[in-house]
UniProtKB/Swiss-Prot annotation:
Protein's recorded name: LIM domain-containing protein WLIM2a
InterPro entries: Znf_LIM
Function in brief: Binds to actin filaments and promotes cross-linking into thick bundles. Has an actin-stabilizing activity. The actin regulatory activities are not regulated by pH and [Ca(2+)].
Ranges for domain LIM zinc-binding: 8-68, 107-167
GN (gene name): WLIN2A
Remarks, miscellaneous: Cross-links actin with a constant of dissociation of 0.4 uM.
Pfam entry (one): LIM
């Protein structure tokens, strides 16, 4: 019995990938040694990589790329090119549907009222939150969209929600507490907005 080989080629080096050294990410074949961040060249594993349009990055560089450019373009910011006398040709292309998803957002976090970008967004009950803001308002416990309770727009972990209900036997004190927290958050946001306006 003879081994006839494989037709799979490594995306990085374009050489044949044999089963013993095969790593498949997003349906693309790599040698284990060739599976590296396209920016820093550090070796990646299936548990610590992100990719966009077939380009793989370590998670820190993937996030940095998004934060620098506001979109998932393939390149990090490069040094400014010298200006030339030639006018820039007008592009007549329309952006792809995917580009529209990352071109910016108007979504504001229901907790801190700051802009929520798609990479950090959690949406529940038509409200958007930063992942870091999506936590129990009573104990600060981490919660998930499948494990939370909300009353009057205030988030609780199920444990604290049940505990607070059992203390009084009703939700009335929670509703009062929720309205106080909402008023405090609105006052804090208004004060921050006033402080951000420069004096003329």
């Amino acid at each position: 019995m003879s081994f006839t080989g494989t037709q799979q080629k490594c995306r990085a080096c374009e050489k044949t990938v044999y089963p013993v050294e095969l790593l498949s990410a997003d349906g693309i074949s790599y040698h284990k040694a060739c599976f590296k961040c396209s920016h820093c060249k550090s070796r990646l594993q299936l548990s610590n990589y992100s990719s966009m349009e077939g380009v793989v990055y370590c998670r820190p560089h993937f996030e940095q790329l998004f934060k620098e450019s506001g979109s998932f373009s393939k390149n990090f910011q490069s040094p400014a090119k010298p200006l030339t006398d030639k006018p820039t040709p007008e592009l007549n292309r329309t952006p792809s549907r995917l580009a529209g998803m990352f071109s910016g957002t108007q979504d504001k976090c229901a907790t801190c009222t700051k802009t929520v970008y798609p990479i950090e967004k959690v949406t529940v009950e038509s409200q958007c939150y930063h992942k870091s803001c999506f936590k129990c308002s009573h104990g600060g416990c981490p919660i998930s969209p499948s494990n939370y309770a909300a009353l009057e727009g205030i988030l609780y972990c199920k444990h604290h929600f049940a505990q607070l209900f059992k203390e009084k036997g009703s939700y009335n004190h929670l509703i009062k507490s929720a309205s106080i927290k909402r008023a405090t958050a609105a006052a804090t946001a208004a004060a921050a907005a006033v402080a951000a306006v420069p004096e003329s």
